[in-house]
UniProtKB/Swiss-Prot annotation:
GO molecular function, one term: ATP binding
Protein name per its UniProtKB record: Methionine import ATP-binding protein MetN 2
Listed InterPro entries: AAA+_ATPase, ABC_transporter-like_ATP-bd, ABC_transporter-like_CS, ACT-like_dom_sf, MetN_ABC_transporter-like, NIL_domain, P-loop_NTPase
Known function: Part of the ABC transporter complex MetNIQ involved in methionine import. Responsible for energy coupling to the transport system.
Enzyme Commission (EC) number: 7.4.2.11
Keywords assigned: Amino-acid transport, ATP-binding, Cell membrane, Membrane, Nucleotide-binding, Translocase, Transport
Chief site of localization: membrane
SUPFAM superfamilies per the UniProt record, alphabetical: ACT-like, P-loop containing nucleoside triphosphate hydrolases
Domain of life: Bacteria
Taxon lineage: Bacteria, Bacillati, Bacillota, Bacilli, Lactobacillales
Subunit and interaction comment: The complex is composed of two ATP-binding proteins (MetN), two transmembrane proteins (MetI) and a solute-binding protein (MetQ).
């Protein structure tokens, strides 16, 4: 990838815990482009935090190569930089976490200034920069408040301002919204997306919540047991997931599975009659604009009872789901199902009446 800011080749991390051998990261190949928002999704223990701590060498790899920008940082598992060069690298990589790690006795401004204490700027310039950062994250009216006077979302905004103090090229967000309520999470993600758009900041999102990457990520990697099992554009991941775990994550973010489970508990679905099919249709892109259900009724004489529908937009492309009961004669139903299969629509037969 020609414009990669992070590139990992055959990277592994191996720990020895007494007699126990742990492979935290296994043979990872990953390139993250400059200026993109890249999501890494996985359950606890998947290895995503171990992977991301390699980027600023808080963890050392056991094998593989790594490039950060134009700097070769690891070759054949050996770290090539140390001392001042390593400190300079880490200054270019900001991090925010689930826990805000603010200085309780310092104000909002003081917390941001703390990140600039080793800067070569004059005191006046540091103060000017800190105030600008506080304003950028929308907290200028809280600049003299202490952390105890702030909400969780406001504390995370301070943490973001502090992480940006040394003009990083990369911002790593490690479960930074997992302790926040949905409304505050949305606001923090909007702030990160705005920073990315305005400054070109590369953002790496580590999360166990697919909803987080769905909202702002350009691309996604799914991890399990230290390995990346699937990676693609966010749209492609949601429109056509390949792995069962990826599908599980997507279902948790869409509400489709919950809706289907409720439908299956309905008495009329439990008593589905012969020549009735409960089906789920998946639409993406231009297929969401097609009047498929009405054309099936018109052209094949089947009736369609829509039980659930959902459309959301991923990367400005619509993705939709319908759960429908189709009924008609056996011949007409077969023709209708065959027609669906010819379209750019995913068909899953959930239940067939008897």
């Amino acid at each position: 990838m020609s414009d990669s800011i992070i590139e990992l080749k055959n990277i592994s991390v191996h720990f020895q815990n007494g007699s126990e051998s742990i492979d935290a990261v296994k043979n990872i190949n990953l390139a993250i482009e400059k200026g993109e928002i890249f999501g890494i999704v996985g359950y606890s223990g998947a290895g995503k935090s171990s992977l991301v701590r390699l980027i600023n060498l808080l963890h050392h790899p056991s094998s593989g190569d790594m490039m950060i920008g134009q700097t070769k940082t690891v070759k054949n598992g050996n770290v090539l930089i140390k001392g001042k060069e390593l400190r300079n690298l880490r200054q270019k990589i900001g991090m925010i976490f689930q826990h805000f790690n603010l200085l309780d006795q310092s104000t909002v401004l003081g917390n941001v200034l703390f990140a600039l204490k080793h800067s070569k700027m004059s005191k006046e310039k540091r103060l000017e920069k800190a105030k600008k950062l506080v304003e950028e994250v929308g907290l200028f009216d809280r600049i003299d408040n202490h952390p105890s006077q702030l909400s969780g979302g406001q504390k995370q905004r301070v943490a973001i301002a502090r992480a940006l103090a040394n003009d990083p090229e990369i911002l790593i967000s490690d479960e930074a919204t997992s302790a926040l309520d949905p409304k505050t999470t949305k606001q923090i993600l909007e702030l990160l997306a705005d920073l990315n758009k305005r400054t070109g900041l590369t953002i790496v999102l580590i999360t166990h919540e697919m909803q987080v990457v769905k909202n702002i990520a350009n691309r996604v990697a799914v991890m399990r047991d230290g390995e990346i099992i699937e990676k693609n554009s966010t749209y492609s991941i949601f429109a056509d997931p390949q792995k069962p775990l990826t599908k599980e994550f997507i279902e948790s973010a869409s509400g489709n599975q919950e809706a289907l489970e409720k439908i299956l508990r309905q008495p009329e679905i439990a008593r589905l009659q012969k020549n009735e099919f409960l089906i789920q249709l998946g639409f993406s892109g231009s297929s969401t604009d097609e009047p498929l259900i009405s054309s099936l009724a018109k052209n094949y004489g089947v009736s369609a009872n829509i039980l659930y529908g959902n459309v959301e937009t991923i990367e400005n492309i619509p993705i939709g789901t319908l759960i429908v009961v189709l009924s008609g004669t056996a011949t007409k139903l077969k023709q209708a199902l065959d027609e669906i299969k010819k379209q750019n629509v995913k068909l899953e037969i959930i239940k067939e009446g008897k």
